[in-house]
Amino acid sequence: MKLIALILGLIIERAATHLLHLRELRWFDAYFDYGEAQARKFPAGFGLIGSLVVLFLPVLPVVVISVAFRDVLWDLPYLLFAVIVLLFSLGPRDLGEEVDEFRRASTTGDDATVQRVGKVLMETDGDDEPVPRAIGEAIFVQANNRIFGVVFWFVAFGPLGAWLFRVSDLYRRRSAFESSRSGNENNHVELIHGVLSFIPARLAALGYAVGGSFDDAFDAWREYRRDDDEPFPKTTDRISAAVGCGAMEVGGNVPATNEAAAGGAMRLVTRALFFWITVLALMTLFGWAV
């Protein structure tokens, strides 16, 4: 059932991407801002509990509906609900469409669009011009936040898992934006998202190795583990970025232009996704997954 819902969700998401702008869910920003203000009132040492409460409240309706739809009409209502939740969990924007827009702008010399889309992909407010390796790394990080994390938790816990990961990413993005504006940092949100991203990021990295240059990918993985001195939440993003760039290296180098780097990274993301869907299909065929 999950495999059917996953395949349907991915197909519809790709085909109807122009109709799914509601997935940006801007109306959650006010909720997160209010929740952050309340969480800061918790006694010292209990801020993590406050952040968890803010995270789990929007997930409760999905839990209730999932339980209510189980074993009703051969699970057809549950299947429909799972596809809808998955559609709203993938994103907020279609990564392939954004990469295509970035590549077109790079090819035609549209610097304004390159700068705008580059900022979105790299989640930065800086004015620095995107460079090929940074763009490649950003696409691999975004793939984990927008696709692989959602897919992993959907397979693990159905609509509940997908929506939980989606809300954690929305919360992380809003918290980072408010932190850059006000200076009030909430490390608990980044920690929670890092925990949820830990396994998907490594599975995605393995998919990149299978779909690209296997030896270069594992060399990059070993090199990163040897040189890593970053705190835990940041390692999740860095390992998928490092292995992804290693997997798409040509002659030991990442493609030299933004257009080539973005295209190579997105093709690798697509191959890794197909690889894991194939693995899931085989597991389902042999009765090892549902």
Question: What residue spans do the PLM features occupy?
Answer:
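Hydrophobic N-terminal alpha-helices or hydrophobic patches in metabolic proteins across all domains
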Residues: 1-290
